[in-house]
Amino acid sequence: LAKWEAGTEPGYKSYDYYDMVMRKNVPQYHINANVTGGSERTNYYLSVAHTGQDAMMRDFKYERTNLQLNIDTKITDRFTIGAQISGKYEKTEDVGLPGGDGYYSAILSMFKMQPIESPYANDNPEYINNVHENGYNPAAFSRDIAGYKDNLTRNANINAYAQYDFSFGLTAKATFSYNYTNSRFDGYQYAYQIYTYDKEKDTYNGTPAVGRWRSQIDRSVPARYMQLQLNYAKQIKNHNISAVLGYEASDYDW
């Protein structure tokens, strides 16, 4: 018991895997700029925003950029056209840990690793230890050693409309939308060496870690939408008359 309390001799040390996996402070920032304006017949709004954040676990990152433009203009007193244009760039960077969710695997490692098990062979940080759960050894939790799993999403959306107001209570409006989404996954789980220390020979015996893989997925989905609408509203003395006629169509490609 005294040796465990001292924690200095090999085989009698304990290891805090929470401190190895989690960070106390992580940076986050958000930048936003917008402009509004116009004239007697035209109005516009433009906004650009960017968000960046590191995770509580090392080498995990997230960033997103958004763009939004709204504009409408009166061609005549009765005829109006307008558009809403938006775009998004979103990326997550993960470490190539076992399983589909790197965050979950990083947290799970704190419970899987034994506190009396060193992450490094002979406590030498040059050699990753051959532990009972090699894929969950935090000593390998970096993009340079374990690999990476990155997800990138790019999206653009355009909504355009034209509206005409007749003098007798009828309004005609046509709307067209186009959406394009591209999703890309790029993952590479590296093969790296793990070591067992031979105390008698003072050597480190290496063996490759198992379960390595490489995957890339690229998917684009364009979608289209159209709407034609007639609205009629009229008040005759104490009577209100209204009617709506519409037509919609949409399609998308996989």
Language model region names:
Residues G38-R41, T73-D77, Y164-L170, K234-K237:
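Outer-membrane beta-barrel strand-turn architecture
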Residues L1-S14, N25, A55-Y62, N66, ...:
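Surface-exposed loop/interface segments of Gram-negative outer-membrane beta-barrel transport/assembly proteins
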Residues V21-V26, V35-S39:
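Outer-membrane beta-barrel initiation region
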Residues D16-Y18:
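N-terminal entry motif of extracellular EGF-like repeats
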Residues E40-Y44, E200-K201:
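Short coil-to-beta-strand
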Residues V48-D54:
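Transmembrane beta-strand segments that form the barrel wall of outer-membrane beta-barrel proteins
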Residues Y45-S47, G82:
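Periplasmic plug
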Residues N32-T36, S47, N70, N159-Y161, ...:
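Outer-membrane beta-barrel architecture
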